[in-house]
Amino acid sequence: MIASRKLQEAAVLAGLARGAARAVRQGLYRGEADHQSWMACLHLHCRTNGRSTELLRRVMKILRPSPAPLRPFESMLGRFDVQGVRTIAEQIRTDGYYVFKERIPDSVCNQIAAAARSTEGLPGRNPEKPQPMAIFDPANPDASVYDIPEARIWQIPGYQRIIADPIFVNLSQAYFGAASVLKQVNLWWSGAVGGQADTNAAQLFHFDFDPAPIWLKFFIYLSDVTPATGPHVFVKGSHRLRQPRASEILSRGYVRISDEDIAEAYGRENIVELSGPKGTVFAVDTIGFHKGKPPETGFRLLAQLEYATPLFVASVSDPLPLPANAEPQLLATRKAYPWAFARFPISV
């Protein structure tokens, strides 16, 4: 009986490995994979406790090396030299996240917030119960989350300044040890709707499995975020693959995990709430377990930039041209790092 189960498991793993290999071939040739092959990567990650993803990360460093060396640069978050960027990348490798000491200027945050207040967002993130686009009302939200459309985000000059900041492409490249591309930008409101966790709004513990094998998300608070207004919560160290304590949780598949199970597996002392004033910036390897804490009162406005290795970031089938009002700083950054903006061609 035991031998039979082992043979069955080996057969399942072999099938998933074939699907994952097919996904990699598709990614190398066209920048995306079909859904079935992509799911094979995800299930293989869960069944191998991250070993398959770790192997793919090593391969990507060979297949897609960094296209340019790091150089010193100026950022809204300060001046960075090469060693400073590498030190931050190393801290992310250790802890899974990093909170920058400096903040985005209030003027930039306020400009984005003003645009977001007058822009319709998509409430709810529930594909089974879609809601019409609506303006977010912080006093009476109809859903726990309102997503601003990505094309509209690129129209906001303040957000363009954030995208143009070289810290994001440089730090992600240093962290990956490989080429880094901008996958997407996001902007959403989170509102208080009773303080109950909403799984569609990512308010229960989970790991991301976005454009494997490695990605890095940058979050910017555009409003003051306190423990009561929905801070990001991360499990320190949970991003490191092949951990024995993660094996049982990952074996459940791509599901939401209770606070109690996370605390038992990783220790309550490693559950970190990231509160901060407007303009706070932090980087997170979201293959680690994380969630957005449901706001108990007030609201949260959050920006997100996601960088990834280019294996599964399509630039042909899902392009989004830069807007006609692209700021000179954004155009200059795109010219300096053309590979990073492959999905975002210049409008003609």
Predicted regions and their residues:
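Short, conserved beta-strand element in jelly-roll/cupin
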Residues: 208-227, 275-276, 283, 306-309
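A structural signal for well-ordered alpha-helical segments within the folded catalytic domains
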Residues: 166-170, 216, 277
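Non-heme Fe(II)-dependent double-stranded beta-helix
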Residues: 7-14, 27, 41-94, 101-203
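Conserved double-stranded beta-helix
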Residues: 2-30, 240-348
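Structural motif
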Residues: 217, 232, 300-302
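Histidine-centered catalytic micro-motifs
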Residues: 202-209, 289-292
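Short acidic/polar capping segments at secondary-structure boundaries
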Residues: 187-195, 210, 223-227, 238-241
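A short secondary-structure junction signal
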Residues: 184, 194, 198-201, 228-235, ...
